[in-house]
């Protein structure tokens, strides 16, 4: 269910702020969003997988916290990221 190394590298390259950047809020939120989307597809086929649902909820909460941090820090970067990822906030 996890992202492959190639998928992670592609996401990091797309959302990085500088060379070697893997920890900026934009990269972290993009990686979490990709994982969340994969898990949502998993739950369409496996509706009773409650153990993995707990992990999904944890990822959604972590993404929300990072987005709240970014919104308080720099609203233009926040708005740009929301638009690029297609999140509704």
UniProtKB/Swiss-Prot annotation:
Gene Ontology molecular function terms on file: rRNA binding; structural constituent of ribosome
Signal peptide span: none
Record's keyword annotation contains Metal-binding: no
Keywords: Ribonucleoprotein, Ribosomal protein, RNA-binding, rRNA-binding
GO BP field: translation
UniProt family annotation: Belongs to the universal ribosomal protein uS15 family.
Subunit and interaction comment: Part of the 30S ribosomal subunit. Forms a bridge to the 50S subunit in the 70S ribosome, contacting the 23S rRNA.
Functional description taken from the UniProt entry: One of the primary rRNA binding proteins, it binds directly to 16S rRNA where it helps nucleate assembly of the platform of the 30S subunit by binding and bridging several RNA helices of the 16S rRNA. Forms an intersubunit bridge (bridge B4) with the 23S rRNA of the 50S subunit in the ribosome.
Protein name: Small ribosomal subunit protein uS15
Organism: Stutzerimonas stutzeri (strain A1501) (Pseudomonas stutzeri)
Upper lineage: Bacteria, Pseudomonadati, Pseudomonadota, Gammaproteobacteria, Pseudomonadales
């Amino acid at each position: 269910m996890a992202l492959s190394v190639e998928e992670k590298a592609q996401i990091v390259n797309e959302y990085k702020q500088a060379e070697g950047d893997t920890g900026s809020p934009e990269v972290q939120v993009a990686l979490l969003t990709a994982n969340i989307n994969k898990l949502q597809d998993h739950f369409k086929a496996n509706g009773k997988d409650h153990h993995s649902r707990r992990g999904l909820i944890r990822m959604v909460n972590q993404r929300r916290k990072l987005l709240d941090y970014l919104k308080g820090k720099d609203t233009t970067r926040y708005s740009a990221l929301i638009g690029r990822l297609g999140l509704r906030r």
